[in-house]
Swiss-Prot record:
Uracil binds at I209, G214, D215, A216. This is Uracil phosphoribosyltransferase. SUPFAM superfamilies: PRTase-like. Pfam families: UPRTase. Pathway: Pyrimidine metabolism; UMP biosynthesis via salvage pathway; UMP from uracil: step 1/1.
């Protein structure tokens, strides 16, 4: 699966990922189809991480007929997936299909919508709950949130993750990102690799991505 490298992100260009995201964007996509689409997109993104960001090695294999050499992915047992509640839940469901042996963590964090976005394009963030496994130096940690808008929530989440430990690789995974969010994450946590399916045009005055997909949590959960 191909990846396009930008200065601010790695962008997935695989045709099926783009197709699935296009279905998610449509306001005619109902709640069940939206949720299922996020699951599918999470699975595809997981394969992209394996293909583009993880190393392989050659091993000797004995088949029922002969000795041969196979190629395996290194580090599949050293993956931690962090679910940023709540919109990431179906996204992570698909991601776990690609990483069935991953350890998982959960962080509940969100904007203070009543306070609004300040002049720097940031929201106050409330972190309500953090439950993470141990993070080791040889781990790949994938922090999944389908929407990376202002980056305020993601930076708060990444700071919680790094308090738990410093992994070998820290990946921020989103479906749709906006330039201000990418800039904030890259400036605040330069060790993170951002992987996204689309970098959209801008944020509106309420901090939503345009054209985006709308409120991913509301659309996925029917609220």
């Amino acid at each position: 699966m191909p990846i396009e490298d930008r200065d601010d992100a790695h962008v997935i260009t695989h045709a099926l990922a783009k197709h699935t995201l296009s279905e998610l964007r449509s306001d005619e996509t109902d709640q069940v189809a939206f949720r299922n689409g996020l699951v599918e997109l999470g699975r595809l993104c997981g394969y992209e991480i394996i293909d583009g960001m993880m190393d392989t090695e050659y091993v000797s294999i004995t088949t029922p007929l002969a000795e041969t050499t196979g190629e395996v992915v290194k580090g599949l047992d050293d993956v931690v997936i962090v679910n940023v509640l709540r919109a990431a839940t179906p996204f992570v469901e698909g991601l776990v299909e690609a990483f069935p042996h991953a350890r998982q963590g959960v962080i509940s964090a969100g904007r203070d919508e009543a306070a609004g976005m300040n002049e720097d394009g940031e929201f106050p963030i409330t972190v309500d709950y953090v439950k993470l496994p141990d993070i080791d130096a040889d781990d790949t940690v994938i922090v999944a949130d389908p929407i990376l808008a202002t980056g305020s929530t993601m930076v708060a989440v990444l700071e919680e993750v790094l308090e738990q430990g410093t992994p070998e690789r820290l990946v921020v995974l989103s479906a749709v990102s906006a330039p201000p969010g990418l800039a904030r994450v890259n400036d605040s946590i330069p060790s993170a690799d951002v992987l996204t399916v689309s970098v959209d045009e801008r944020l509106d005055e309420d901090g939503y991505i345009v054209p985006g997909v709308g409120d991913a949590g509301d659309r996925a959960f029917g609220t």
